[in-house]
A protein has these predicted regions:
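Residues embedded in well-ordered secondary-structure elements
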Residues: 8-9, 52
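Bacterial N-terminal signal peptides
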Residues: 9-16
Length: 329
């Protein structure tokens, strides 16, 4: 079934590598930055993706986005024990799922560009910044301080990346997916909003609500390009009216809640609405990372607690993300 948001369903993009000059062919054009990166073999971004090794266990799990989202997802990954580490059955085995792994938290300090999608210019910039955030997170380049650009720091490469921003999922995911396909990179980058949407069980009569303080336009943009989503998006509701004594969940007869407010605990919603399917970002991210790392066979297999390190992602004058060591490394 198809989600009933608009009557327009865009065709899925087609990608190809043509001879020695890779390019993207698509019903929906990618931004110029992506086209230029694909064509320019000498660019740092092209070389980074061209040399990416899918089966290399070296590197870290990287979470990039706003502070609250990154902290929540990193904590969830750190404590995750949802699978048997031997045969991947969905049972607890008292061994942390990501034992021996390093979780890198990359916090985008200026969230302003993530909220400027209301204008065409802002949406275009957000699309470009999504790709740039991914490249910076996968790369090994970082600095000790922003004031001393000659003082390099050590940053392990990213082997799995979670981009937490729903705005990036709505506006920049398409461009990033297009770029990764050209380099045959799969099972590497995940968006919590997309992972939750994929978990919705039902049909077009399934009434879906989103717990979020972000504009509904953001989610309409995201679902416009998700033709396989099973359900009908009824509305986007801030936590205050979801948790109110007379909740919108009851008055709107919702069947599913997607939790996109990291200040709300999923267990609180499940206790309040026991008959509702509640999908939360932490759980779907844990599952996606675990299964992808098993498929690619990139666990370190070190017997140790997970570790984490922190970086700040700061935009420079050229609108490039510069990663610097964070105080909470």
């Amino acid at each position: 079934m198809k989600i009933r948001i608009s009557s327009i369903i865009l065709l899925a993009p087609l990608f190809c590598l043509c001879g020695c000059q890779p390019k993207v062919e698509s019903e929906r054009p990618v931004i110029q930055f992506v086209s230029d990166l694909i064509q320019d073999r000498s660019s740092a971004g092209h070389q980074l993706l061209d040399s990416f090794k899918q089966k290399d266990p070296g590197g870290n799990i990287v979470i990039c986005g706003p502070q609250e989202e990154v902290s929540s997802l990193a904590f969830s990954l750190f404590l995750s024990d949802n699978f048997d580490n031997v045969d991947a059955r969905p049972v607890r085995d008292s061994l942390l799922d990501f034992s021996g792994e390093v979780i890198s938290r990359v916090v985008i300090k200026d969230e302003g560009p993530l909220n400027t999608f209301e204008t065409e210019e802002g949406a275009e910039r957000l699309r470009e910044l999504t790709v740039k955030a991914a490249l910076a997170s996968l790369d090994t380049l970082s600095y000790r301080t922003l004031s001393d650009m000659s003082s390099y720091s050590h940053k392990a490469k990213g082997k799995v990346l979670v981009l937490s921003s729903s705005a990036m999922a709505a506006y920049g995911k398409y461009d990033l997916d297009s770029l990764l396909r050209v380099f045959n990179i799969q099972d590497v980058i995940f968006f919590p909003l997309e992972l939750m949407a994929e978990k919705v069980a039902g049909d077009e009569d399934t009434r879906v609500g989103i717990v979020s303080s972000k504009p509904k336009k953001l989610y309409e943009e995201f679902f416009k390009y998700q033709p396989d989503f099973e359900g009908s998006l009824i509305g986007v509701y801030p936590k205050e009216i979801v948790l109110d004594s007379v909740s919108v969940v009851d008055t709107m007869a919702l069947d599913v809640l997607l939790l996109d407010d990291y200040s709300v605990r999923a267990d609180t919603l499940r206790a309040r609405f026991p008959k509702i399917q509640v999908l939360d970002p932490g759980k779907v991210v844990n599952e996606a990372c675990f299964k992808a790392m098993r498929r690619r066979n990139i666990f370190t297999h070190r017997v140790a607690y997970p570790k984490w390190e922190g970086f700040s992602a700061i935009l420079n004058e050229d609108s490039e993300f510069i990663l610097t060591d964070s105080d909470d490394r």
